[in-house]
């Protein structure tokens, strides 16, 4: 298994509130672990929230295997921290997490940070955004990609640290040879369309080179937000084309 993680402040923001973690090696009893968190909150609160979530989840999972309980436990601790310090009030973060075991991808998410599977030359979003616009789309009240959708797509309906209890969504996918997994913050997915992401991931080069290209593409298209990328190649195999 190969993995590479990279984050960038972007071209507009002065602070990077995205936080990443990638371990293709064992983390406690887990065979591997990959995380992206996107912080929100004024001043340094968002930066603190994303870092707190990732670092404390890794610590939790070094001693336990229950990803769901880990997310819930760290969420509660983050929420309690926001109550104790005035400068942290209202802070929170998104989270997308992945574990790969014996050819199976296990993914979890809260918010609008995403996990994509690149399989057989095509890209597919595995996670579902917890956002106002996606809820409207699901109810048939909004068209994805419409002007109203684009105006309101940053309104998220679920995030870590906002409430004492949280319910992450979980997904399971069987992997095949040649597949890639991409975890990212909305700084990538809001800037770069799926076909372009797919083409970059399937292009020649190392995972590091591909991660650099993804971030460069987001910055070329405006770089209006922090950008986080975790790119994973679980197994060896040939490359297709989008």
Regions found by a protein language model. Give the residues of each.
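PP2C/PPM-type serine/threonine phosphatase catalytic domain
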Residues: 1-242
């Amino acid at each position: 298994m190969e993995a590479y993680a990279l984050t960038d402040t972007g071209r507009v923001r002065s602070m990077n509130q995205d936080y990443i973690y990638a371990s293709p090696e064992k983390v406690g009893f887990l065979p591997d672990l990959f995380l992206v968190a996107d912080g929100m909150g004024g001043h340094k609160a968002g930066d603190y929230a994303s870092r707190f979530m990732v670092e404390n989840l890794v610590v939790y999972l070094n001693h336990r295997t229950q990803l769901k309980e880990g997310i819930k436990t760290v969420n509660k601790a983050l929420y309690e921290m926001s109550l104790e310090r005035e400068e942290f009030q209202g802070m929170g973060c998104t989270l997308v997490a992945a574990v790969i075991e014996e050819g199976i991808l296990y993914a979890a998410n809260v918010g609008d940070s995403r996990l994509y599977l690149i399989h057989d030359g095509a890209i597919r979003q595995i996670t579902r955004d917890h956002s106002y616009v996606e809820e409207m789309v699901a109810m048939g009240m909004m068209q994805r990609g419409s002007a109203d959708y684009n105006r309101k797509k940053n309104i998220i309906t679920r995030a870590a640290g906002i409430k004492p209890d949280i319910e992450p969504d979980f997904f399971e996918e069987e992997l095949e040879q040649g597949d890639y997994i991409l975890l990212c913050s909305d700084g990538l997915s809001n800037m770069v369309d799926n076909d372009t992401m797919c083409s970059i991931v399937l292009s020649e080069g190392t995972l590091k080179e591909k991660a650099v290209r993804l971030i460069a593409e987001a910055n070329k298209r405006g770089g209006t937000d922090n950008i986080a990328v975790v790119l994973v190649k679980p197994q060896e195999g040939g490359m297709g084309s989008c």
